[in-house]
């Protein structure tokens, strides 16, 4: 039984950009239904840019619906032109299958696949078996080339070149929706706003072939307050795989959220009650930093688990100083409200031998080697500008030696870049 209409949850939390028919969608969601969202297996891990659709699938499942994560193993062989100014590099089947396997493990962290409450399906299972002539006759005849060329996903590519393989993408995505409708009783698709044209094509195809009504809903394309694409940093993508982005780095991404985005991100990327999230509007600077810590903790907990979130919070508190979280601020959060151990094990670290440190390592070299700076020249500039620190003390010369004399009581050396990026040196 559905206790609350998930459409209202989506509206309240800012998930919805466009919808085929608001009244019809809300009515459809009054009873359990199946809804799918597509994911490209173009990398071994999903990244933060995939979190909005993942959170939507979780909300759907929590409200009694069947969430379908459709992995585009078939469509990835072609490449989606939506939102792209250039043709994507075509991956091998082996690489796509490996990525899809990794994605299944990731989805299992967010969704329960027991009793088909959620499904992960690969469209390669049917797309790679299609007969081209039959597909053109049965599916292609329902598509107007004029309408296809008017779609935003194609219009932006026409001047730079759109090849025939990519031109077929809309047909294949529409066919995915039809296939899921026919075989899994899936009546709704959700996705990024750049997919709107493809999603409407699927709704129209179901109407033409089956004479039935299907629904589509899009998410807003998120950027940060600085205009940066969601999930991008100077190091690249922020991954959901802890081997690619550690829980500590993941936590740090969220805690560095811009002030204007805190409330929006709490609504989208946590399950905290909205009446608590609304508190953010009236917070001062100090309290807003507490809200960022809660956002970072809750987001890390959802992706990496409570233990990893606690370790990341604790390491951050050790590195930056304890900031007591007011007990009245978003009390549903399980973030610690002041308890602290001195465990900084979640902070990224490198190991150096005693002999290396005894001889001394130039500061600019070790700042580059540990990954705080992308090059030695960047490290030299950073130190010259006063942005390099060892054990919270400024590094005054780029060739200042980091030695065993810098080891603290725990036998470690703490390096810092700017205000927020740390690295630990451990002796092996």
Curated annotation (Swiss-Prot):
UniProt motif ('KMSKS' region) ranges: 229-233
Keywords of this entry: Aminoacyl-tRNA synthetase, ATP-binding, Cytoplasm, Ligase, Nucleotide-binding, Protein biosynthesis, RNA-binding
Motif 'HIGH' region location, chain numbering: 41-50
Binding site for ATP: 232
E.C. numbers: 6.1.1.1
A biological process from GO: tyrosyl-tRNA aminoacylation
Catalytic activity entry: tRNA(Tyr) + L-tyrosine + ATP = L-tyrosyl-tRNA(Tyr) + AMP + diphosphate + H(+)
Residues engaged in binding L-tyrosine: 36, 169, 173
Top enzyme class: ligase
Xref: InterPro entries: aa-tRNA-synth_Ic, Rossmann-like_a/b/a_fold, S4_RNA-bd_sf, SYY-like_C, Tyr-tRNA-ligase, Tyr-tRNA-ligase_bac-type, Tyr-tRNA-ligase_bac_1
Subcellular compartments: Cytoplasm
Primary location class: cytoplasm
A cellular component term, taken from the record's GO annotations: cytosol
GO molecular function: ATP binding; RNA binding; tyrosine-tRNA ligase activity
NCBIfam families: tyrS
Similarity-based family: Belongs to the class-I aminoacyl-tRNA synthetase family. TyrS type 1 subfamily.
Biological role: Catalyzes the attachment of tyrosine to tRNA(Tyr) in a two-step reaction: tyrosine is first activated by ATP to form Tyr-AMP and then transferred to the acceptor end of tRNA(Tyr).
Protein name: Tyrosine--tRNA ligase
Record organism: Syntrophus aciditrophicus (strain SB)
């Amino acid at each position: 039984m559905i206790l609350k209409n998930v459409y209202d949850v989506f509206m309240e939390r800012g998930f919805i950009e466009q919808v085929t028919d608001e009244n019809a969608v809300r009515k459809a969601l009054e009873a359990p239904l199946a809804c799918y969202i597509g994911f490209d297996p173009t990398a071994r891990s999903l990244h933060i840019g995939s979190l909005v659709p993942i959170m939507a699938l979780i909300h759907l499942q929590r409200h009694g619906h069947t969430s379908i994560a459709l992995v585009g193993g078939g469509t990835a062989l072609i490449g989606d032109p939506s939102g792209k100014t250039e043709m994507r590099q075509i991956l091998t089947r082996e690489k796509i299958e490996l990525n899809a396997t990794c994605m299944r493990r990731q989805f299992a962290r967010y969704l329960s696949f027991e009793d088909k409450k959620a499904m992960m399906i690969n469209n390669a299972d049917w797309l790679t078996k299609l007969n081209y002539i039959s597909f053109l006759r049965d599916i292609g005849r329902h598509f107007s080339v004029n309408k296809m060329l008017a779609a935003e996903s194609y219009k932006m590519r026409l001047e730079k070149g759109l090849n025939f393989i990519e031109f077929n993408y809309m047909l294949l995505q529409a066919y995915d929706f039809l296939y899921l409708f026919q075989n899994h009783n899936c009546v709704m698709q959700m996705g990024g706003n750049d997919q709107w044209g493809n999603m409407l094509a699927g709704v129209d195809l179901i109407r033409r072939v089956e004479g039935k009504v299907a629904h589509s809903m899009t998410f807003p394309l998120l950027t940060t307050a600085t205009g940066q694409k969601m999930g991008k940093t100077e190091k690249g993508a922020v991954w959901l795989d802890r081997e690619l982005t550690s829980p500590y780095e993941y936590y740090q991404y969220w805690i560095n959220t811009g002030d204007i985005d805190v409330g929006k991100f709490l609504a989208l990327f946590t399950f905290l009650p909205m009446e608590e999230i609304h508190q953010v509007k009236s917070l001062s600077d100090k309290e807003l930093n507490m809200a960022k810590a809660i956002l970072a903790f809750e987001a890390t907990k959802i992706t990496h688990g409570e233990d990893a979130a606690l370790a990341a919070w604790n390491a951050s508190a050790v590195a930056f100083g304890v900031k007591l979280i007011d007990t009245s601020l978003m009390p549903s959060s399980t973030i610690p409200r002041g308890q602290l151990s001195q465990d900084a094990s979640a902070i990224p670290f490198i190991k150096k031998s005693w002999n290396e440190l005894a001889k001394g390592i130039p500061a600019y070299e070790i700042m580059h080697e540990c990954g705080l700076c992308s090059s030695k020249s960047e490290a030299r500039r950073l130190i010259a500008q006063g942005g390099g620190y060892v054990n919270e003390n400024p590094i005054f010369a780029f060739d200042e030696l980091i030695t065993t004399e810098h080891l603290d009581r725990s036998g470690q050396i703490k390096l810092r870049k700017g205000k927020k990026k740390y690295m630990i040196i451990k002796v092996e």
